[in-house]
Amino acid sequence: MSEAVPSAAPRPLRPVYIPAVGPRLRILMWAVFVLVAILGANSAYLAGVTFLSWSSGRTYENWFYMLMFAGHLALGLLLVVPFVVFLGIHLLNTRLRKNKRAIRVGYALLVASIAVLISGLLLMRVDLGGEASSALVIKNQSARAVIYWAHIAAPLSCLWLYWLHRLAGPKIKWRYGGGYLLVTGVVAGGMILLHNHDPRHWNQAGPKEGEKYFFPSLARTSTGNFIPAQALMNDDYCLKCHQDAYKGWFHSSHHFSSFNNPAYLASVRETRDVAYKRDGNVQASRWCAGCHDPVPFLSGAFDDPKFDDVNHPTAQAGITCTSCHSIVHVNSTRGNGDYTIENPEHYPFAYSDNAMLQWINNQLVKAKPAMHKRTFLKDLHKSAEFCSTCHKVHLPFELNHYKEFLRGQNHYDPYLLSGVSGHGARSFYYPEKAVHNCSGCHMPLKESTDFGAKLFADAKQPSIHNHLFPSANTGLAWLKNSPETIAAHEEFLKAKLRVDIFGVKEGGEITGKLHAPIRPEIPTLKPGETYLLETVVRTLKMGHPFTQGTVDSNEVWLDVTVTSGGRVIGRSGGIDDQRSVDPWSHFINVFMLDKDGNRIDRRNPQDIFTPLYNNQIPPGAAGTVHYSLEVPADITEPVTVEVKLQYRKFDKIFTDFFTSKARPGDLPIRGHKPGEPYVNDLPITTLCSDTVTFPVEGSTLTVENPQVEFPVWQRWNDYGIGLFLKGKAELRQAAEAFTVLDGLKEPRRYDGALNLARVLHREGRLDEATAALARASEYTDPPAPEWTIAWLSGVINREQGRLDEAEKNLRKVLEDKTEERTKRGFDFSLDYEVIELLGQTLFERAKQVRSPADRELRNSLLRQAVDAYEKVLVLDSENVGAHYGLQLVYQDLGDTAKAAEHAKLHARYKQDDNARDVAFEKARRKYPAAARASEPLVIYPLNRPGAPGQQVVKQ
């Protein structure tokens, strides 16, 4: 019987081979490849334009670029799903392959690919609405920079890893890749080259052809043509991302600069009416519109004499976001709207009414904001020169039909020449650090969640610059019924000035014995005697004169009340029953006249002629005011003097004017009732105050006074400065004040000697002034400002005939670069008053060189004088002294054509002193209170019969 043969063991089943990329997956792969190829070409174009912008410092991104960027986002989103599906299936198909190297490289490629997708999604800033969506948006610039470069680097690493990964598979067909790169390079390169011919030209003046549309305003458009109103009135578009900035702007004086401001409306209507009756058109009023009414002006509607200044769509726009942020060039610092503005380049669909297209536009802006930022925020916007375009004016012949040039308001030049800017070498005080632009004060940082908010160096939270532009226009805020805006302006005004009851003089005369400084010692007043109260107002934190701007209608005055035992015994600055301030008060304003001696009291610029007086206080300076007080003989109780510096935006005369000119159909004016007298209830803000109680001889009552918070040396210095700035009337008293200051044992400071030198120089006592300067230079703790010492030394040396030394002094001011100047941000090379003085000195040196053998030296000095005067004109093209100097220098050089040119310009900018005297005489007869205030020496009586408030009894 045979044995059974065992059957063979079954062979193990071989695993079914799964290709890495099967037929159906290959279709998906090619779809991914096509999307990646298109994205690659698109990315090459985007990267090229970005690099071109970065390398040149110009913006080459435009509407087409943003359309391509939208395509980049769309293609990227479209790629996500097929790419992830392909990677998932491909990973499953190859996870068991034996080629571990290929698998590891594949995993690395997977990580790099995911990095591309995730970084792209993080950069998108997709906003779906709501706080949760906003929280997902990455705003931190440092984090975004890291993500951006990851998004750039990851695709490059993908290419390298893909090549390594493919070494395990079929050979790469390089000819296809080469062809793709060639076509992509040619097309993208050509498109990038076309960007190099971008028609937008920033930082240059618009064509002169635009004058026919805009003159006598100096504003220009970049094309010379009008700009559509739609482009200038797109504020709601800005609101989407800049809510806090928009809110500030909405309540600002900039927003209500135009026909939406009832005060301006009445004034500009008068200007247009006068121009139309005189010229047959309203083109003279363009002078106003370049700054106040940019939307109707730049869009072409303003020139219509029948322009509906209430209901026209552009009439209520004011200075819009685009009106400022689309300015591409400051043509000069002449003011009068001397800027160039463009129709800004927007992202695709910016003006679309379709909600989806608007959403796409918003995402493009947020994902790629560089073009938006460069278009709407340029370096010029951060400069004081930008503000000069509208905060400096002159009155041209086309407006007044009198003279080609009259200076109007001017914030810019006093700021430039102040110590605050770090450019003025002749100031009484200097800040620890210069403030290099207007926004340093008027656009303070404000915490914000706006999309454009960022963490500034000196901020604890993301912030923006305050677009309320806090300043002082409480009147307009009151008319618009905005108490929050009033409060913001009043908060801004705190600690900007101070008032100091500094001393009293016996006999009520400036020559009387001075008791000062009051506090801690208080002199005892004698019943029946007359005293002079010495009051000082000091500007503290401002870079321009107080008040500047609309100085003819700003109402700022000293309100003085003297009481004893509950009764008022002295008064100045009271308000009568009609809400008018006593005209015999001391006003810090400009009393402006027309040619017939009438006060400019309606904001009527076409009639401005000359000021009767100018009581403004320069930055870092002071004004001294004298009050005569007759102490009643029957007084038995202490005397309390309270001085308040009061501010009201408009006086009663002006509020009566603009309310009486309201027409049917106008927007309502707060407090105005047609047919009834208007009550001027505009807010009165107390800017600063001081109170002193004096003991009275014969009274046993004791008095207490709070301690003065600022040092004695400053009080003496401010008092002396105020006297010095009055001109020649009180130079002796100023010298006495500075002499006392120079003699103080504690602290020992240079101010007394230095400012005494100023007084002695003005008096012509040059040797004594030189000695005082030498004494000021000896102080070391703190040292006297070497630039001011050098300037005054140059002035004195020049007048003493030591021209070589004077030139060295003045060049030291302008050219030295010291450690202290650098640390504090000072650059006195822009002080054009010193530059002009250098030009005069060089010219005088040249005149001393008479020998024919030294002709070369003479001509060299004359050429240097020309250079100095030309530098002045770069900074102030309307400088009358520089034009006169050039006229004389060119005459000596034999250049009669240029001498005649500058003679003509000198005549244009020179004041008409003869005509001014006629207006003065007429004004003095019409306005006795103003005539008194215009005298070189003014003493305001506190016991004037009939003064408002005299009979008021304090409770």
Describe each region flagged by the PLM.
Residues 2-205:
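Membrane-embedded alpha-helical bundles that constitute the cytochrome b-like, heme-associated redox core
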Residues 3-12, 101, 140, 172-183, ...:
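Primarily the internal scaffold of c-type cytochrome electron-transfer domains
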Residues 714, 751, 785-788, 826, ...:
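Start-of-helix register in tetratricopeptide repeats
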Residues 726-728, 763, 800, 845, ...:
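Structural motif corresponding to the intra-repeat A-B loop/turn of tetratricopeptide repeats
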